[in-house]
Amino acid sequence: ITHTKTTESFYALADGAADLLLVYAPEASALEYAEDRGVELLMQPITRDALVFLVNADNPVTSLSQEEAVGIYSGKITNWSEVGGEDRPIVAYQRVEASGSQVMMRAQVMKDVEMVDAPTELRPGEMGELIDRVASYKNTANAIGYSVYYYVTEMYLREGVKLLAIDGVQPSNETIASGEYPYCQDVYAVIRADEPEDSPARILFDYLQTEEGRDLIEAAGYVRLVEE
């Protein structure tokens, strides 16, 4: 299994280098890439995740408003004292462009507000590296970063960090499933529409939408998608 960034994964699917994706919603450019090549895609939500903000465990701040999160990443808020914390400069980590979490950050948090440019040293290439840096940045509580809920809580558990509530709502399986936590996003299974009915990719795509498939997804630690 080759892991690539979300946008690059869609390129691979459109080019026939991949048969099935389990991914977050892509940038519009990824869908346009497939359309330009005459490739129709089938996207089916199978679970739900969320963008979460993490800080050093010693940081006294426990919650940000949505406006404060935008303020930090637009460069308008630069000190923790402006959001109820100590008088310390905020060191705001970002993800690399084309990563799923960066796409989510721009679409769900920043929306039409431009993100402040971050130097290369504040853009770790991998999510695990970002978490490590937030946990250990000069042994202080200055740092903040963002990742996705499943990765932080299931794949890369790390002492020294904590998740922030947003508007007083702590991210959890329950608040993400219900949509109460504001930065939720579905995770999709994606195949090409012309994938043969008896191919392994099509069979798995269909299986993940069954009750047994949903049970398996939940047993793996993912948030169960609530049927409308």
Where are these regions (language model features)?
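Exported/periplasmic ABC-transporter solute-binding proteins
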Residues: 1-35, 39-228
